[in-house]
Regions:
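Sec-dependent bacterial lipoprotein signal peptides
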Residues: 1-22
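Secreted/extracellular small peptides and ectodomain modules produced from precursors
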Residues: 2, 22-24, 82, 171, ...
Length: 395
């Protein structure tokens, strides 16, 4: 069994969840023969700051036209940090009319309401889509048709799973929808008056996911796959990944992982013993040498840096390999290192899996690796007095 490195991440003064690092971030093969990361293998609710507001929402950060590493289709409204305890707000652009349907949401009796939106472009009915949530004594699994909303209580380090389970190929499953090979999830920690959560691509892509948080003070934040990704077919998304990433990463979206998942590099050839296990070695040597870093170098796919989130992010984003970026003990020295995302992923070696999800994420944000929250570029959002969360699930 691979060794897992776990860190607690804090926001607004309390722990919001766990982020799993290294070889375990990809998890073992999925329990349903999915050829990819299984539900128990990934990151929890890693902290960070950021998020971006929906169009027309009151914004506490200024919108900008920042580009993540110049990747095709990237850009969008990255924002400056928002108010304390909240995700930064920026421009999310306009989704198709009716995409974010917030009608018929009753007031919550617990903390907040969740509403589930079928955005599979007619591929599946609400009876074919399922959500599942388990926490303590809670165990709920329902189709979107049966229960399109859920009154969410306070809970810590929670995951809500989404499944496609239709009576015919290619996603046929019988009896238990949670045995479907086509699934994905969101993560959250919800306090009595606080929402903290994110979409994630740390483990893999399984289904298109986006979510919009609405709070009592009018704050809104929207994160996840962008409108163009939701509009295209599943085959097109897989083909686009293969077309846009370098040769070393193409197999992540091909069999045996496809058609079920696009897996993170550590679940593919970048793991220990894999054909790309030494992919980052030359850059790591440069980064360590330029900064006189004395801590141990990471293992394959950057594993072993649980206590050094900035170093981890630097390796995956291909930055920081100049003197003055880090202290000898591996701590960030150049506080401006994360200010310009156009410098990220600019040349190899870099985590082009993560870059792809940033390029096709709302506002250029994604959770493409465990410490993608460094610099507020992840899909993590946090705000007080949440009223509802809209979750869009696509195919």
């Amino acid at each position: 069994m691979a060794t897992c490195f776990v860190r607690a991440a804090a926001s607004a003064g309390f722990v919001v969840g766990l982020s799993v690092w290294g070889a375990c971030s990809g998890g073992a093969a999925g329990p349903n023969g999915s050829g990819g990361a299984g539900p128990t293998g990934g990151a929890g609710n890693a902290g960070g700051t950021g998020g971006h507001a929906a169009a027309g929402a009151a914004a506490s950060g200024s919108a900008g036209a920042q580009v993540i590493g110049g990747a095709p289709g990237s850009g969008g409204g990255q924002s400056t940090a928002g108010a304390s305890g909240s995700g930064g707000a920026g421009g999310a652009g306009g989704s198709p009319a009716g995409f974010w349907d917030a009608s018929n949401i009753p007031a919550a009796k617990n903390v907040m309401m969740f509403k589930f939106l079928n955005r599979t472009n007619g591929q599946f009915s609400d009876a074919d889509l399922f959500w599942s949530f388990k926490s303590g004594s809670i165990s709920e699994t329902h189709s979107f048709a049966e229960q399109p909303i859920y009154d969410m209580p306070a809970n810590s380090s929670g995951r809500m799973y989404f499944y496609v389970c239709a009576p015919a190929a290619p996603v046929s499953c019988t009896g238990d929808p949670t045995k479907s090979k086509f699934y994905d999830f969101i993560e959250h920690t919800i306090g009595a008056t606080q929402y903290n959560g994110n979409t994630t691509r740390v483990d893999a892509f399984g289904l298109k996911i986006a979510m919009r948080l609405h709070c009592a003070d009018g704050y809104e934040a929207t994160v996840g796959e962008d409108d163009a990704t939701f509009a295209e077919s599943r085959d097109a998304t897989f083909a686009k990944f293969v077309a846009e990433v370098p040769a070393e990463f193409k197999a992540l979206a091909q069999p045996p992982y496809a058609p079920y998942r696009i897996v993170e590099p550590g679940a593919g050839a970048f793991k220990a013993g894999g054909a790309q296990a030494a992919y980052y070695d030359t850059f790591v040597d440069q980064l360590w040498s330029a900064n006189g870093i004395t801590i141990a170098k990471p293992g394959p796919n950057g594993s072993g840096l649980a206590a050094y989130p900035d170093l981890s992010a630097a390796i995956f984003r291909h930055v920081g390999n100049v003197a003055g970026s880090f202290t000898p003990d591996g701590k960030l020295m150049n506080k401006n290192l994360w200010k310009d995302p156009a410098t990220f992923y600019a040349e190899a070696p870099a985590n082009y899996y993560a870059r792809f999800w940033h390029a096709h994420g709302l506002g250029g944000k994604a959770y493409g690796f465990p410490y993608d929250d460094v610099g507020s570029y992840s899909t993590y959002i946090s705000h007080a007095n949440p009223q509802y969360l809209l979750v869009a699930v696509g195919w």
